UniProtKB/Swiss-Prot annotation:
It comes from the Bacteria. It comes from Chromohalobacter salexigens (strain ATCC BAA-138 / DSM 3043 / CIP 106854 / NCIMB 13768 / 1H11). Signal peptide: none annotated. It is an enzyme of class 2 (transferase). The keyword Transferase applies. This is 2-C-methyl-D-erythritol 4-phosphate cytidylyltransferase. Keywords: Isoprene biosynthesis, Nucleotidyltransferase, Transferase. The record marks R16, K23 as: Transition state stabilizer. CDD domains: CDP-ME_synthetase. GO terms for biological process: isopentenyl diphosphate biosynthetic process, methylerythritol 4-phosphate pathway. It catalyses: 2-C-methyl-D-erythritol 4-phosphate + CTP + H(+) = 4-CDP-2-C-methyl-D-erythritol + diphosphate. Pathway: Isoprenoid biosynthesis; isopentenyl diphosphate biosynthesis via DXP pathway; isopentenyl diphosphate from 1-deoxy-D-xylulose 5-phosphate: step 2/6.
C-alpha cells in the first residue's frame, strides 16, 4: 500500500493581512493558525508523513504544534511554488513513485476532516491528480481597469479551487519540472498538472474551507472553528450531497 505524504507550505509573510506577524502565527483560541491546520490534517491522516516548509529564519515556530510522529522541517522558498519544490526534493530518497502527495495551504485551518478523507479516496482512482473545490455559486463579473463591469461571466463549469491538491509523487514531480522548464507561472499544484496536459479531478468540498487572507477571514475562521452555525451559513457551507447536486446542476 502506498504511503501518504503531506506538504504544508508555511513560509509566507501574509502581507495582505496587514498584521504584525505572518498569518500562520495569528491567534485563534490561544493557538496559532498553523497549529489548528496541522491538527485538522492529523485528525484525518494520523499515519501520514509531513513536510513542513518554513522560512529558514523563522523563530516563531514551535515543534510542539506538530502532532505528526513522522515529520520534517524543510526550507521554504521565496514563493509558494519554491517551497513545494523543496519539499518534493526532500522526498526523493524516501517516496515511491505511486505514493500520494497532498499539498495544503497552512492558512486553511477549517478544512473538513470528511473532505480530506474523501479527497484521498477519490485520488486512489485518479492518476492525474485532483483537488478539493466548490462550484461557483455567485454571479461573476469581468471588470475593466477602472473597476467597471465589462460583462457577466457565465459560471457554468466554474469552480473555486481549494486545497489540498495532489497527485502521485512521480506525476507531481514531473509536472513541476515541466512547468519550470516551460516558464509557466504556477499558482497551485493543479496548474502544474494542467500545464503538463493532465486534467486533475475536482472533488466537491465544503465552502467553509476558507483561506485566511484578509483580517475579516480570521474572524470568520475563529467562529467556524468554534462551531458557530451562523458562520457556516454565511460561508454557504453545504453538505456533501448538496455540493454534488450543485456540481451537476
Amino acid at each position: 500500500m502506498s504511503r501518504l505524504w503531506l506538504i504544508v507550505p508555511a513560509a509566507g509573510q501574509g502581507r495582505r493581512m496587514g498584521a504584525e506577524c505572518p498569518k500562520q502565527y495569528l491567534d485563534i483560541a490561544g493557538r496559532p493558525v498553523l497549529a489548528h491546520t496541522l491538527a485538522r490534517l492529523h485528525e484525518a491522516f494520523p499515519e501520514a508523513a509531513l513536510r513542513l516548509c518554513l522560512d529558514p529564519d523563522d523563530t516563531r515556530f514551535s515543534p510542539e504544534w506538530v502532532p505528526f510522529a513522522d515529520w520534517q522541517r524543510v526550507a521554504g522558498g521565496r514563493e509558494r511554488v519554491d517551497s513545494v519544490e523543496n519539499a518534493l526534493a526532500s522526498l526523493a530518497d524516501v517516496a515511491a513513485d505511486d505514493d500520494l502527495v497532498l499539498v495544503h495551504d497552512v492558512a486553511r485551518p477549517c478544512v473538513a476532516v470528511e473532505d480530506l478523507r474523501r479527497l484521498r479516496e477519490a485520488l486512489t482512482t485518479s492518476p492525474e491528480g485532483g483537488l478539493l473545490a466548490a462550484p461557483v455559486a455567485d454571479t461573476m463579473k469581468r471588470a475593466d481597469a477602472r473597476g467597471h463591469v465589462v460583462h457577466t461571466v457565465s459560471r457554468e463549469g466554474l469552480w473555486h479551487a481549494m486545497t489540498p491538491q495532489g497527485a502521485p509523487y512521480r506525476v507531481l514531480c514531473r509536472a513541476f519540472a515541466h512547468a519550470r522548464g516551460a516558464g509557466v507561472v504556477l499558482t497551485d499544484e493543479a496548474s502544474a498538472l494542467e500545464a503538463w496536459g493532465l486534467a486533475p479531478r475536482l472533488v466537491p468540498g465544503r465552502r467553509d474551507n476558507l483561506k485566511i487572507t484578509h483580517p475579516e477571514d480570521l474572524a470568520l475562521a475563529t467562529r467556524l472553528l468554534a462551531g458557530d452555525p451562523a458562520s457556516r451559513r454565511a460561508t454557504g457551507a453545504l453538505s456533501d450531497d448538496s455540493l454534488a447536486d450543485e456540481a451537476r446542476s
